[in-house]
UniProtKB/Swiss-Prot annotation:
This is CMP-sialic acid transporter 4. Belongs to the nucleotide-sugar transporter family. CMP-Sialate:CMP antiporter (TC 2.A.7.12) subfamily. PANTHER family: NUCLEOTIDE-SUGAR TRANSMEMBRANE TRANSPORTER. One of its GO terms (biological process) is transmembrane transport. It is found in: Golgi apparatus membrane. Keywords: Golgi apparatus, Membrane, Sugar transport, Transmembrane, Transmembrane helix, Transport. It is a multi-pass membrane protein. It holds the Pfam family Nuc_sug_transp. It comes from Oryza sativa subsp. japonica.
Amino acid sequence: MQRNGVMECSVCHSKVVAPSPRSVSRAYDKHRSKISSKYRALNFLLVSGDCILVGLQPILVFMSKVDGKFQFSPISVNFLTEVTKVIFAIVMLIIQSRKQKVGEKPLLSLSTFVQAARNNALLAVPALLYAINNYLKFIMQLYFSPATVKMLSNLKVLVIAILLKFIMRRKFSIIQWEALALLLIGISVNQLSSIPDGTKSFGLAVTTIAYIYTLIFVTVPSLASVYNEYALKSQFDTSIYLQNLFLYGYGAIFNFLGILGTVIFQGPESFDILRGHSRATMFLICNNAAQGILSSFFFKYADTILKKYSSTVATIFTGLASAAFLGHTLTVNFLLGISIVFISMHQFFSPLAKVKDDKPAGALEPEDAQNHRSSDSSFVNMTAGAADDASHLTATDERKPLLPI
């Protein structure tokens, strides 16, 4: 039972501080610092895989067009992508369950599934937001040029940082805020060269609906990423494949509802989800599914900011590959842009830019020191079986780790 930020055991009536969003962030950071070498290796693999998948996506989208148009329904692509990810999550759950040790709670039991579903109900929020965003990507092409869409997507960097600050209680130093601003500038400088001459306001269509789509296009995916990270990390001990099963299952449901909506407005023929698809679109679906799966590892074991930097680096490598293999010319804007991006990345992840706690985890004000010592004593006694003294542990301490170290 939870009351006034404190959880009380219904059996022994001991009290423990309830985790807050900041507790989730702190606990994760402390857990991560213990496995820094594995963390760096995982980050390298995540960024490398993301660069490959993001780099392939523009090529597959181009190959999916027929006479410059899409012959398939965008919602059908999103639905098939979610179904692919659900199948992958189920397969990985089966493999993981077979490797469980004796005495561990079975992953595939009904009780485990129901309990995990309750604990991860928040994943329905990013699933809905992703469904909206994936459809919006195609809609944006109707109102803006591709270069303008890229320019607008740059605003997500700052929006994500602001949302992380308020939702995840993440703290950024002044140097890190400057690094994020540099990232925004670097990407913009790179893409300015692709905007046609004579286009005003970066090609913005001055209509009310265009501005509404712009606001949604920037806000929705940022909210989805941050809420996804919060939902995954708040249940850190739950298998990521089980969490993905819920996330992708919700996504498939929302996209299927979108298909039913198109049937109502466009007729029964739009229910054929395979209409207009080709071999290229099947590769596109697999690529999108792989990106979604990889993103879940970013959000649970890394963070949203690293994912954004990774996607930026992937775009840069795509430009370099185009110059090397397709003969495209590298502009001055591109070279200046990537230089600014790499400076931003080095600055953001530099140890000097890390936010330091105002006070160490064990530091307290002098007047609170005596109370803290009695609280620690109560906690020790509780572990020894003295449940009567455990009720002294009622002070709110957001620095208390949520995750097991």
